[in-house]
């Protein structure tokens, strides 16, 4: 089975080439980035973050798509600039999950950042972690701690945790390691990295598990042309409990897919 995770930075511009999605929806994927991704990798499940798409419109995207008949959406419940066009997550699946949850335990999910899907052989969390630059206290004292409680309270079957974690793990995951030493910007604050280390007490970063010495990134600052210059960060991950690592076939990064400031990550499991 193949699972892809991608912070798409706005799904509308990545499913139709003219960047516009009418209120009536779209019946087929245009010759654009999402279609390129699907044709290249043929994933069984796609976890999408930062859809910036209300549920009402998401449900009109390829409603008769035979390849992914099961599509689930979560949206921001805010207003104004934090309304339904902000944040958001989605799961597209060839296989029908046994259960899909949009709220879990004590996690506040008003921005549509979290989805949980249970399948027969494993469970899956798709999440778009808040950037600490906008709400440091919430991120470090509430969100991360609640996620840690959720993932460590779920050990009876494999739990794949994926998405945009908005944190750098090690020096291999950032083009300029001095940024880690300074620890003065979102994504490299000590509190964020300490919580990520806590996640890894019972879970493994699957890309680093398969490629221990590779320097490959999943996010670039577009304003400074970071992608063209190779100045990136790896902040998108697949995590899995240590005791289930024998089910991992491969975990890779595809930085050839355009359309976002992030690129997709791919997990293959047995």
Regions found by a protein language model. Name each.
Residues 1-64, 73, 79-86:
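N-terminal, active-site-proximal structural segment of metallo-dependent hydrolase catalytic domains
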Residues 52-132:
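Structured beta-strand-rich core segments of catalytic domains in phosphoester-bond hydrolases
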Residues 1-5, 9-17, 23, 29-35, ...:
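Active-site regions of metal-assisted phosphoester/phosphodiester hydrolases
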